[in-house]
């Protein structure tokens, strides 16, 4: 279904946006989707923006206390392109601080799943997924480093699209990890993802990693299941996934199981690279220039920065400490440089399979845990939740997460990964999937 096209064709009743804002305010207090709601919206198709993507004149904090009060004097390239084509900003969405999290609970306002508010919404783009799940006519601009679009999309039952690295400009993004970050989208349909991609991709002089490329729409009939990933998923997810694979097989897709032993190194390689780059990116937040200001200059150097850095959350501090160690001169070659080499090996191996197939897997290895359960997880348990989404993100490949089932009323998703610049082929796959699988939403805020 083309929600964007349908909305633009329909006549909006008088006071539509005021009514939408009023209803959204109530649900936002319940689920924690938005850090900021734009009360000035009065026209255009509503889009939300993850709070680590800059919008001129709107507070942008990446859900961190250290950026409290930061108002960018510019907008990200992707935002300018979409605003030019009739999209209007509904607000800035909640997220794990700086993107550090898989569940949406590493922020001042923990996000809650719209299908069960005792459960997590997924992270780090938690608010983007919640907003998409509760608003009928809406799209979310989000960002993924290791699965930050796919994970919440799966837990909240919406479509999440992560493009090939470089396809959408990162200018205006508050970086987590420069070599891994990708701006992408969430929506209620693959057709709307196609519309968003058409308006967003293309070379940007402000981002040297951005590219101009002609994309084709060709999907693939051969789907590969990677044994090393399949063996690590929860039994209920495995049963659901097996049923989905049977449906696809009956629809004419050729399904194969293959082994990629190197993929087992994805999680440690990802976290070594991302932590090293994150510690560099966070060094700029000192309490002087951006956001939080520490005004007492009578203190000594160490006391001043100790006070400023207290504004970082626990996971941010962990990333800074580990990342700084990894970059140290005495261990850099042992960890960071070796991780870069292994990333290349994994990418080459995956590329060989992706020449004539897509890789299919569940999006997440478990159903959405309760908030209480997630808060009790160790860092290693948290990191292991990304095992299915990290490989494609690590290699810069595009992927799409599609709702595929509902277990005890909770959404689960499948993830389809394509080769470099096979983005629109994945969207075509999603469009075909949606012809036979109906998505369920508990809320349809803003319906006409």
Regions found by a protein language model. Name each.
Residues 83-197, 398-404, 410-413:
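Short glycine/serine-rich loop segments
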Residues 46-48, 90, 222-226:
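Short, well-ordered beta-strand segments
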């Amino acid at each position: 279904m083309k929600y964007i096209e349908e909305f633009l064709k329909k006549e909006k009743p008088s006071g539509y946006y005021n009514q939408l804002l009023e209803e959204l305010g109530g649900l936002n207090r319940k689920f924690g989707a938005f850090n900021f709601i734009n009360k000035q919206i009065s026209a255009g198709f509503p889009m939300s923006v993850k709070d680590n993507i800059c919008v001129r004149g709107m507070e942008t904090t990446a859900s961190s206390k250290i950026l409290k009060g930061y108002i960018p004097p510019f907008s990200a390239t992707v935002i300018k392109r979409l605003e030019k084509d009739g999209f209007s900003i509904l607000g800035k969405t909640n997220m794990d601080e700086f993107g550090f999290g898989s569940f949406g609970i590493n922020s001042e306002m923990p996000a809650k799943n719209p299908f069960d508010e005792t459960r997590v919404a997924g992270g780090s783009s938690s608010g983007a997924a919640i907003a998409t799940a509760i608003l009928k006519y809406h799209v979310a601009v989000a960002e993924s480093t290791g699965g930050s679009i796919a994970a919440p999309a799966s837990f909240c039952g919406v479509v999440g699209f992560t493009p090939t690295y470089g396809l959408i400009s990162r200018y205006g993004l508050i970086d987590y990890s420069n070599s891994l970050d990708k701006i992408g989208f969430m929506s209620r349909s693959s057709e709307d993802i196609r519309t968003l991609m058409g308006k967003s991709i293309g070379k940007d002089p402000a981002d040297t990693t951005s590219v101009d490329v002609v994309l084709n729409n060709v999907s693939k009939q051969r789907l590969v299941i990677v044994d090393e990933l399949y063996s690590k998923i929860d039994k209920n997810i495995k049963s659901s996934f097996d049923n989905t694979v049977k449906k696809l097989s009956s629809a004419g897709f050729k399904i194969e199981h293959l082994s990629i032993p190197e993929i087992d190194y994805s999680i440690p390689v990802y976290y070594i690279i991302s932590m090293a780059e994150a510690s560099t990116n966070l060094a700029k937040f000192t309490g002087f220039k951006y956001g939080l200001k520490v005004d007492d200059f009578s203190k000594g150097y160490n006391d001043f920065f100790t006070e400023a850095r207290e504004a970082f959350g626990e996971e941010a501090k962990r990333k800074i400490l580990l990342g700084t160690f990894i970059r140290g001169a005495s261990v850099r070659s042992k960890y960071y440089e070796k991780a870069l080499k292994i990333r290349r090996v994994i990418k080459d191996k995956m590329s060989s399979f992706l020449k004539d197939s897509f890789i299919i897997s569940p999006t997440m290895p478990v159903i959405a845990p309760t908030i209480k359960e997630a808060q009790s997880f160790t860092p290693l348990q948290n990191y292991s939740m990304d095992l299915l989404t990290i490989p494609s993100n690590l290699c810069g490949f595009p992927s799409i997460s599609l709702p595929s089932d509902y277990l005890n009323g909770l959404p689960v998703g499948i993830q389809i990964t394509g080769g470099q610049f096979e983005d629109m082929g994945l969207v075509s796959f999603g469009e075909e999937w949606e012809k036979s699988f109906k998505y369920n939403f508990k809320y349809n805020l803003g319906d006409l």
